[in-house]
Amino acid sequence: MAPFDFRKNKSMSSPDTLQIPTDLLPRDGRFGSGPSKIRGEQITALVADAPTYLGTSHRQATVRSKVGEVRDGLSALFNLPEGYEVLLGNGGTTCFWDAATFHLIAEQSQHLSFGEFSSKFASAAKEAPHIKDPSIITSEVGTHPTAVAEEGVDLYALTHNETSTGVMMPIVRPAGATGLVAVDATSGAGGLMVDANEFDCYYFAPQKSFSSDGGLWLALCSPAAIERIESLAASGRWTPAFFDLKITLDNSRLNQTYNTPALATIHLLASQIKWMNENGGLSFSSGRSRTSAEILYSWAEASDFATPFVTNPADRSNVVGTIDFSDDIDATVIAKVLRANGVVDTDPYRKLGRNQLRVAMFPSIDSEDVASLCACINWIVGNL
């Protein structure tokens, strides 16, 4: 096999033959942006409870108590003010976007669109025939726009962390706005600090910072959001039962889901929330991600072949880091060598189309492993 040219016009070693020294490798090589690394302790806890938990009815006390543990744990983790409630339903964040067009948006929404995922809720609202076309504020990838109060808008849709680009934004109610503030926190929740007083609905899925699996959505809802759900349900607006947030609300108050959930997902989620709360809460979990981010971005800034994709340091995500490489370095080859050596899922988001790596830094990922990843990349570049 001919050598693979890693740097242009130079003879290089084949990436297929490279073995990274074991003393450089991370202890755990999982850096995927979702599904994410699951801690071994979560698996051990699930196995211990499996005989009496798995394969049982989700409407019986065994599972409902675990759902209650999730709801109470999230209330504590996010220090939810009085009157806020935790809702959960099947289908993931994509399902929640559709549900929100029925029972959170009364007439019109405003959306900040600055990447693949932040644009999807805007598309869902635009395609819904029973509400007005949304107002959409965009910015270039690698940046984020700012919400502004707008007449007629009754819901402001923000995104805490744009998973596709590695941009995070502060969650603050738009000045002078009277509508609800709904935040897509799919990859940000649990890994970024947030003040519950700044949102009415903070929704996410558990396969990122919460080290569980997909197919479930959770939403932290203020009294105003609860009132919106109830009033739109009472208005007679037709809603498919799967997207009916009033049905979700009623079932959540009973510590259950409308239809059968994945029990393992709920158990893994409960274990992760417990781990976060027992070690100091959101300041602990977000602190772990912040430390990992400092390591990754400091390495990239000091490198002569890599640089953070997001130019404004304040906008660089603490949970999903995107690192660009110089034109004479092929990031796909780096990812290939890493994978061959057990360091997986560092590939960039496919639709972004950049010569970069994307590194998850969720709370379960040890900061020492992020440092080891950086050392591995240096070794690969030096040996290709």
Which residues does each PLM region occupy?
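N-terminal "arm"/small-domain region of PLP-dependent enzymes with the aminotransferase-like
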Residues: F6, K10-S57
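PLP-dependent enzyme catalytic core of the Aspartate aminotransferase-like
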Residues: F6-K8, S13, D28, K351, ...
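Active-site C-terminal subdomain of aminotransferase-like
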Residues: K37, Q207-Y297
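Conserved N-terminal alpha-helix of the aminotransferase class I/II PLP-enzyme fold
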Residues: A50-A99, E116, K120, A124
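PLP-dependent aminotransferase-like
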Residues: T94-D154
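Active-site phosphate-binding strand-loop segment of PLP-dependent enzymes
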Residues: T138-G190, C201
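Conserved active-site segment immediately N-terminal to the catalytic lysine
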Residues: A196-Q207, W217
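Conserved PLP-binding catalytic core of the aspartate aminotransferase-like
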Residues: T307-V337
